[in-house]
């Protein structure tokens, strides 16, 4: 049941991975914003990291512009195959998507942002069976713009498609896509400190993964899940404006439905 504490509700919002299906989150944040639902913390992994920073910056109504800009390109399967209008994912994020982010608005926000990436262990640790480790980059208030950009690139740095042996280096440490260590960044903080944890997942696989890993939903914290009610029209590596519009609309409608059902629960 939704909480009613007579005080401001403390909420965490988690945006999952999903590659190009992440356009769904543009609709999610639009519905949350129109309902006036506020969050103290927003976490994101992979494409969800871009959703997290746009949401925290209050760029709700500009975020689809970044998705639309991608439609001037196709997704290259590898940097070796890049052309002027076909680019690998890291290039697209760095040069097409992130320039839409208003760093000043994000710095002025009182929302704490958590970005998940997967740290690559040394070869010696790999021999011991340790390949990746979850790592969070956190931002609130003043920060260096390049540090945020590096964190997002690390979180979105899918293996192979950005280069077979390539990775994103930050301070000498190598990182790959945050989804490799968990599709949903609910482990960014202790969820027990929140009244509500909202989880938006462009694929139901992420939610199933949470319960496989033993997510405890039995405490006082309420967990609210937003997942596609039907299959998203966009494939993970597909760039298509009409399908992006449909994915946005589905995210908008699904989130409105979740909000409405909660209002009915409270009478």
Predicted regions and their residues:
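Patatin-like phospholipase
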Residues: 1-45, 53-267
């Amino acid at each position: 049941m939704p909480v009613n504490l007579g005080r401001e509700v403390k909420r965490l919002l988690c945006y999952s991975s999903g590659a190009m299906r992440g356009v769904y989150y543009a609709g999610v944040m639009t519905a949350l914003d129109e309902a006036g639902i506020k969050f103290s913390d927003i976490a994101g992994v992979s494409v969800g990291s871009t959703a997290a920073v746009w949401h925290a910056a209050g760029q709700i109504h500009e975020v689809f512009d970044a998705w639309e800009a991608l439609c001037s390109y196709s997704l290259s399967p590898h940097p070796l195959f890049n052309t002027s209008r076909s680019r690998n994912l890291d290039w697209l994020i760095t040069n097409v998507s992130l320039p839409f982010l208003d760093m000043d608005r994000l710095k002025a926000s009182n929302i704490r942002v958590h970005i998940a990436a997967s740290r690559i262990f040394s070869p010696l640790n790999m021999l011991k069976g340790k390949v990746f480790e979850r790592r969070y980059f956190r931002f609130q208030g003043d920060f260096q713009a390049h540090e945020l950009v590096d964190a997002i690139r690390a979180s979105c740095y899918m293996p192979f498609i950005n280069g077979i042996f390539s990775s994103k280096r930050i301070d000498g440490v190598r990182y790959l896509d945050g989804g490799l260590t968990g599709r949903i960044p609910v482990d960014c903080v202790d969820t027990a400190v929140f009244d509500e944890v909202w989880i938006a997942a462009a694929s139901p696989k992420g939610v199933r993964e949470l319960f496989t890993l033993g997510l405890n939903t039995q405490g006082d914290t309420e967990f609210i899940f937003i997942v596609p009610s039907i299959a998203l029209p966009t494939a993970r590596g597909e760039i298509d404006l009409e399908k992006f519009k449909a994915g946005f609309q589905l995210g908008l409608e699904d989130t409105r439905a979740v909000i409405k059902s909660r209002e009915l629960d409270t009478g």
